[in-house]
C-alpha cells in the first residue's frame, strides 16, 4: 500500500521550493514543511499518546500533522472555535503528553508539555526524520458530537488514510502541482479531503479562515490573488459563495474540479454550479467520520441532473462494500472503517463490528440503491447535519437541560428542500417567561460556554409540557409539528 510520507518525500526532492501550504501571506515550501515536521517528530518520538494539535489556519497546523505522523504518535486536531469546556473534555479523554499550540490563545487545565511554533522554529533538532508510523497505527483522532454531551473520538488507521488519499488522487483529473482550496477547519474531517490528496499530488494547500467565511469579499480577494484549481468544501459553503454573481467560469477559469462532502448537495445548488462551470468536474461524495471522510462519489453532470432529484451520492470506492439492513440502515464494510471510539468500548460496540478481521460500521443513515447508485434518505436516529457539521440533537438537549431556566427540552431541526437549515429548541421553562427575548438571550449565553456556535438553536418555543407517545416516550414528531406549525 502507498505511504503518504514516502510520496511527500518524493515531492520534497522533486520540488523543494514549491509552496506546500499557504494562508494569506504565510506559506511554507515542501522543503520547509519537511524540515519543520522532522524537528517536531524528534520532539514527539518518545510520546506514547496522540499529540493534541490546537489552532486555526496556521500552516504550522500541517507541520503538526506531518510531524505527528512521522513520529508515529498520531494527532488530535482541535480548532480555536471549539468552546474551552469542550476542549478540556477532549484533553481529559486523550491525556496527551504533548500539545502543539499554533495559536496565540492559552490552554488551561493541562499537565501536558505545551509546544509553540517558536519552539519548533528555534529547535536545534535534525531536519531529517525517518517515519515511524505503521499502517495499522492510529494516524488521527477526530472528535464528533456525542449523545451524552461527551464528544466521541473517532480513531482512523494510517492504512485507511493512505487508501483514502490514493482514491482521491485518482478522482482528481487536474494533475499534479495544482492549487487546492480547503474550507473546513481541521477539527472537521472534511479538511482531510483537501490536505492529503493535495500534498500527495504535489499541490499547494490554500487555507480559508473563519474571517473569509464571514466576509465573502475577503474570499474573493484570495481567489483573485491565487487562482484555484481544486475546490473542497461543504455544499453550504458553495451555496454562500454562489451569492457572488461573479463566481463563474469566465472570472475563475482555473477552477476545474469541485469536491463536496459533509452534507446533502441539493439539486438546485448543483444545477447552478454546472451552469456556471460547464467545463469543470463536480463531485458529490458521502461518508461519515467513522469511515475516513468519504466512501462514495459521483460526477454531477447535466445527464445526472436531468435523471435524478434528489441527487445520488454515487458508487462505493475501491476496497469498501456498502449494504442496507432490512430497516434501510446503511452499513459500511472495509478498510475505510474506523478502529472505534477512543476509550469508549460501549459506544464502539453499539455501532462497530470487528469479527473475522472485517470491520463494519452502522451509519444510522437511511439509504437505498437504484440504478447501481446509492441515495441517502436522512437519519434513522436523532443525528443531523447542519452546515456540514454532524451533531446529535440529544447532546444539545443534554446541555439545554443543564440551564436553571429549563425544565425539559427537545431540539427540532427545521428542514428546507430536504436539508437542515436551523434548529429550534422546544422548552418547558422552570418559571413563566415574562420577557421572551431576555430569556432566549440568557439561555443562548449559557450554551455558548458549553457548545460550538453552530449547535445552538436559533430560537426557542416555550411549552407548558412536552407531548408523549402511548409508550410514554417523548413524541418528537408531535413536538416538531407544534414547533413548525
Swiss-Prot record:
GO cellular component: cytoplasm
GO MF term list: ATP binding; D-alanine [D-alanyl carrier protein] ligase activity
UniProt catalytic activity: holo-[D-alanyl-carrier protein] + D-alanine + ATP = D-alanyl-[D-alanyl-carrier protein] + AMP + diphosphate
Pathway(s) served: Cell wall biogenesis; lipoteichoic acid biosynthesis
InterPro entries noted in UniProt: AA_adenyl_dom, AMP-bd_C, AMP-bd_C_sf, AMP-dep_synth/lig_dom, ANL_N_sf, DltA, DltA-like
Subcellular location field: Cytoplasm
Positions contributing to ATP binding: 144-145, 284-289, 365, 473
Coiled coil: none
Enzyme type, top EC level: ligase
Gene3D superfamilies listed in its UniProt record: 3.30.300.30, N-terminal domain of ligase-like
Function: Catalyzes the first step in the D-alanylation of lipoteichoic acid (LTA), the activation of D-alanine and its transfer onto the D-alanyl carrier protein (Dcp) DltC. In an ATP-dependent two-step reaction, forms a high energy D-alanyl-AMP intermediate, followed by transfer of the D-alanyl residue as a thiol ester to the phosphopantheinyl prosthetic group of the Dcp. D-alanylation of LTA plays an important role in modulating the properties of the cell wall in Gram-positive bacteria, influencing the net charge of the cell wall.
Family: Belongs to the ATP-dependent AMP-binding enzyme family. DltA subfamily.
UniProt protein name: D-alanine--D-alanyl carrier protein ligase
Lineage: Bacteria, Bacillati, Bacillota, Bacilli, Bacillales
Encoding gene per record: dltA
Amino acid at each position: 500500500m502507498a505511504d503518504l510520507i514516502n510520496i511527500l518525500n518524493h515531492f520534497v526532492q522533486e520540488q523543494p521550493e514549491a509552496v506546500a501550504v499557504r494562508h494569506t501571506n504565510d506559506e511554507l515550501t515542501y522543503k520547509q514543511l519537511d524540515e519543520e515536521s522532522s524537528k517536531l517528530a524528534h520532539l514527539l518520538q518518545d510520546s506514547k499518546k496522540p499529540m493534541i494539535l490546537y489552532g486555526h489556519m496556521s500552516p504550522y497546523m500541517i507541520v503538526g500533522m506531518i510531524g505527528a505522523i512521522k513520529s508515529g504518535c498520531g494527532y488530535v486536531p482541535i480548532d480555536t472555535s471549539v468552546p474551552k469546556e469542550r476542549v478540556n473534555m477532549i484533553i481529559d479523554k486523550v491525556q496527551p503528553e504533548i500539545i502543539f499550540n499554533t495559536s496565540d490563545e492559552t490552554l488551561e487545565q493541562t499537565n501536558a508539555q505545551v509546544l509553540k511554533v517558536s519552539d519548533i522554529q528555534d529547535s536545534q533538532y535534525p531536519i531529517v526524520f525517518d517515519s515511524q508510523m505503521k499502517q495499522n497505527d492510529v494516524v488521527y483522532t477526530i472528535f464528533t458530537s456525542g449523545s451524552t454531551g461527551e464528544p466521541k473520538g473517532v480513531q482512523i488507521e494510517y492504512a485507511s488514510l493512505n487508501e483514502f488519499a490514493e482514491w482521491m488522487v485518482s478522482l482528481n483529473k487536474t494533475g499534479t502541482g495544482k492549487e487546492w482550496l480547503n474550507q473546513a477547519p481541521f477539527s472537521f474531517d472534511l479538511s482531510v479531503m483537501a490536505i492529503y490528496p493535495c500534498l500527495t499530488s504535489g499541490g499547494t494547500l490554500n487555507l480559508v479562515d473563519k474571517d473569509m467565511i464571514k466576509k465573502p469579499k475577503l474570499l474573493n480577494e484570495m481567489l483573485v490573488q491565487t487562482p484555484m484549481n481544486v475546490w473542497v468544501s461543504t455544499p453550504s459553503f458553495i451555496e454562500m459563495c454562489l451569492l457572488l454573481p461573479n463566481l463563474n467560469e469566465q472570472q475563475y477559469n482555473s477552477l476545474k474540479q469541485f469536491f463536496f462532502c459533509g452534507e446533502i448537495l441539493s439539486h438546485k445548488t448543483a444545477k447552478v454550479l454546472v451552469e456556471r462551470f460547464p467545463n469543470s468536474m463536480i463531485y458529490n461524495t458521502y461518508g461519515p467520520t467513522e469511515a475516513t471522510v468519504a466512501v462514495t462519489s459521483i460526477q454531477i453532470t447535466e445527464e445526472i441532473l436531468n435523471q435524478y432529484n434528489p441527487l445520488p451520492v454515487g458508487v462505493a470506492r475501491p476496497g469498501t462494500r456498502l449494504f442496507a439492513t432490512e430497516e434501510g440502515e446503511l452499513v459500511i464494510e472495509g478498510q475505510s472503517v474506523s478502529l472505534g471510539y477512543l476509550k469508549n468500548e460501549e459506544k464502539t460496540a453499539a455501532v462497530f463490528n470487528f469479527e473475522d478481521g472485517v470491520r463494519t460500521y452502522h451509519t444510522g443513515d437511511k439509504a437505498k440503491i437504484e440504478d447501481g447508485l446509492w441515495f441517502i434518505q436522512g437519519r434513522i436516529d436523532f443525528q443531523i447535519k447542519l452546515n456540514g457539521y454532524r451533531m446529535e440533537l440529544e447532546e444539545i438537549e443534554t446541555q439545554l437541560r443543564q440551564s436553571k431556566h429549563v425544565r425539559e427540552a427537545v431540539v427540532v431541526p427545521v428542514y428546507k428542500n430536504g436539508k437542515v437549515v436551523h434548529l429550534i429548541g422546544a422548552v418547558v421553562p422552570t418559571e413563566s417567561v415574562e420577557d421572551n427575548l431576555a430569556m432566549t438571550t440568557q439561555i443562548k449565553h449559557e450554551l455558548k460556554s458549553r457548545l460550538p456556535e453552530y449547535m445552538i438553536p436559533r430560537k426557542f418555543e416555550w411549552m407548558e409540557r412536552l407531548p408523549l407517545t402511548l409508550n410514554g416516550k417523548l413524541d418528537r414528531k408531535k413536538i416538531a409539528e407544534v414547533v413548525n406549525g
